[in-house]
Amino acid sequence: MTEKIYDAIVVGAGFSGLVAARELSAQGRSVLIIEARHRLGGRTHVVNFLGRPVEIGGAGVHWCQPHVFAEMQRYGFGFKEAPLADLDKAYMVFADGQKIDVPPATFDEEYTTAFEKFCSRSRELFPRPYSPLDNHEVSNLDGVSARDHLESLGLNELQLASMNAELTLYGGAPTTELSYPSFVKFHALASWDTITFTDSEKRYHVQGGTNALCQAIFDDCRADSEFGVPVEAVAQTDNGVTVTLADKRVFRALTCVLTLPTKVYADVRFEPPLPPEKRAFIEHAEMADGAELYVHVRQNLGNTFTFCDDPNPFNAVQTYAYDDELGTILKITIGRQSLINLENFDAIAAEIRKIHGDVEVLEALPYNWAMDEYARTSYPAMRKGWFSRYKDMAKPENRLFFAGSATADGWHEYIDGAIESGIRVGREIRHFMKATA
């Protein structure tokens, strides 16, 4: 029997890989999807907590994000709204652990002031945000850290602490490491509007969950698939690509799409080796040390939101669900998981009590993306000096094509960026196949 040679092997079944596979199969190409996990979704995933579906990875979507909105429209998915409006209570925990109760309207006003000052040049720097490097000043500013810029703005204590908490969440590292313009780009992508940006990151999720949207895209692929075994090696010649799995099975194709989280590339042997600029990006560019956590509290805390400044381990703590019978489910976004042992229930409970007083913490559901061997980072946050080099990672290498949200021109820490990159590599391979036919 003749060995099958695919037109394309797609490594990874997150949004970028699934969209790439669908685009290629729609061109009539034969496609094989290889996924190390036993599921779809990559760094998005829905699990059950107290009988409720909860997102433990990437989840924020919005109609200002054109690629994910198009997929939601295509497959008939609406928006689920998080309970962030009409807060009952808002809190700020400062770097030294001091907590203050802030009237929600004041909290919103002070944070918005800080955010708009931080992003005040977003239209000037990113007049066309899907061509983020067209303005050469962006590359010149890439070496400026978010913290350096933040401290230049003359903010008051609450403004500085709340914005630094937000930036720590996005950077997954001390804000002295995060590229200033890499964050400002998000404001530009949200039509240079702060409320739109905040809604895109915290307010709206996919109705039915990211799992269901991934499944809809997968069902639209005419592709073979292999789940549960990681890729060990990728070798290319002038004539094709050979992909070897950890169980030593070998698959061959004319092209290969790689959608691995950036730091996971170091676990794959490439022959010939990837070029120096890609290897440097893999080693140095990203730093997001993040995790997600849900906590069940016996008391009904109402609708609350808390920012905790670095080095507090919990950066954003918000009510997910609440009533007198349930008590409260809190959703916690952690920029730096290394600051707390998420396997230690008592440590988690102690942090919750720093915010909400003497409450009874009943249960916790953590997911540590930074310690996940198939993720290594929670999202592609860009270290200062590296945002301007993202195209080094996106550039094809002969028969190898690179996707994943880190390679996106637009929303690089979001589902939208992943989908954008999958569409791009579908186009790149179509052109490549025509040129080499």
UniProtKB/Swiss-Prot annotation:
Cofactor annotation comment: Binds 1 FAD per subunit.
GO MF entries: (S)-6-hydroxynicotine oxidase activity; nucleotide binding
UniProt-listed Enzyme Commission number(s): 1.5.3.5
Activity control summary: Partially inhibited by Co(2+) or Zn(2+) and significantly inhibited by Ag(+), Cu(2+) and Hg(2+).
InterPro entries: Amino_oxidase, FAD/NAD-bd_sf, Flavin_amine_oxidase, Flavin_MAO
Temperature dependence: Optimum temperature is 40 degrees Celsius. Stable at temperatures lower than 50 degrees Celsius.
Alphabetized UniProt keyword annotations: Alkaloid metabolism, FAD, Flavoprotein, Nucleotide-binding, Oxidoreductase, Plasmid
Cofactor(s) essential for the protein: FAD
Pfam family, one: Amino_oxidase
Residues annotated to bind FAD: 16, 35-37, 43, 57-60, 231, 405, 413-415
Catalytic activity, as annotated: (S)-6-hydroxynicotine + O2 + H2O = 6-hydroxypseudooxynicotine + H2O2; (S)-6-hydroxynicotine + O2 = 6-hydroxy-N-methylmyosmine + H2O2
Disruption phenotype: Disruption of the gene abolishes the ability of the mutant to degrade (S)-6-hydroxynicotine.
Keyword Transcription attached: no
Pathway: Alkaloid degradation; nicotine degradation; 6-hydroxypseudooxynicotine from nicotine (S-isomer route): step 2/2
GO biological process, one term: alkaloid metabolic process
Entry's pH dependence statement: Optimum pH is 7.0. Stable between pH 6.0 and 9.8.
Keyword Flavoprotein included in the entry's annotation: yes
Purpose: Involved in the degradation of L-nicotine. Catalyzes the oxidation of (S)-6-hydroxynicotine (6-hydroxy-L-nicotine) to 6-hydroxypseudooxynicotine. Oxidation of the pyrrolidine ring of (S)-6-hydroxynicotine leads to the formation of the optically inactive 6-hydroxy-N-methylmyosmine, which hydrolyzes spontaneously to 6-hydroxypseudooxynicotine. Acts with absolute stereospecificity on the L-form of 6-hydroxynicotine. Also involved in the degradation of nornicotine, and catalyzes the oxidation of 6-hydroxynornicotine to 6-hydroxymyosmine, which hydrolyzes to 6-hydroxypseudooxynornicotine.
Family: Belongs to the flavin monoamine oxidase family.
Description of how the protein assembles with itself and partners: Homodimer.
Name of the molecule in the record: (S)-6-hydroxynicotine oxidase
Organism this protein belongs to: Shinella sp. (strain HZN7)
